[in-house]
Amino acid sequence: MQIVATNKKIRDYEILETYEAGIELKGTEVKSLRERNVSFKDAFCRVRDNEIYMLNLHISPYKFANRFNHDPERPRKLLLHKREIKRLIGKLTTTGLTLIPTKIYFNDHGLAKVEIALVRGKKRYDKREEIKRKEINRKIKTYLKYGE
């Protein structure tokens, strides 16, 4: 598995569930992905006509594609099983939940996949608590390792 990109903003969310989905891509998008020219900035998923689309994912134009290049921020359809889509639609009707892509990778068969997560936004105090907890754990580990 070759990881192309990971979403750094996922730290701001509480992950409830993760799903693996295929992405409907054009040829120049695949070539650009292989060169790791992708940005997750403000990327999210939406339901439209009982299908899930990923919006605001920026895949840079392939530099050798000339006039046949793709639109860098076009909506991309995610390929999931019907039962997964129905389950996600049911959960997304709950307030405060959203779908966010966490990473894009090529699997062992060379197919582009995206891992999406059903998430709930963390509050500011939750983020501070998590930072404090990590800092305390780090201090404990150094104390156990060095003794003082």
Swiss-Prot record:
Coiled coil: none annotated. Pfam families: SmpB. One of its GO terms (cellular component) is cytosol. Keywords: Cytoplasm, RNA-binding. GO terms for molecular function: RNA binding. The keyword Transmembrane does not apply. The keyword Transcription does not apply. PANTHER family: SSRA-BINDING PROTEIN (PTHR30308:SF2), TMRNA-BINDING COMPONENT OF TRANS-TRANSLATION TAGGING COMPLEX (PTHR30308). NCBIfam families: PRK05422.1, smpB. Belongs to the SmpB family. Required for rescue of stalled ribosomes mediated by trans-translation. Binds to transfer-messenger RNA (tmRNA), required for stable association of tmRNA with ribosomes. tmRNA and SmpB together mimic tRNA shape, replacing the anticodon stem-loop with SmpB. tmRNA is encoded by the ssrA gene; the 2 termini fold to resemble tRNA(Ala) and it encodes a 'tag peptide', a short internal open reading frame. During trans-translation Ala-aminoacylated tmRNA acts like a tRNA, entering the A-site of stalled ribosomes, displacing the stalled mRNA. This is SsrA-binding protein. The gene is smpB.
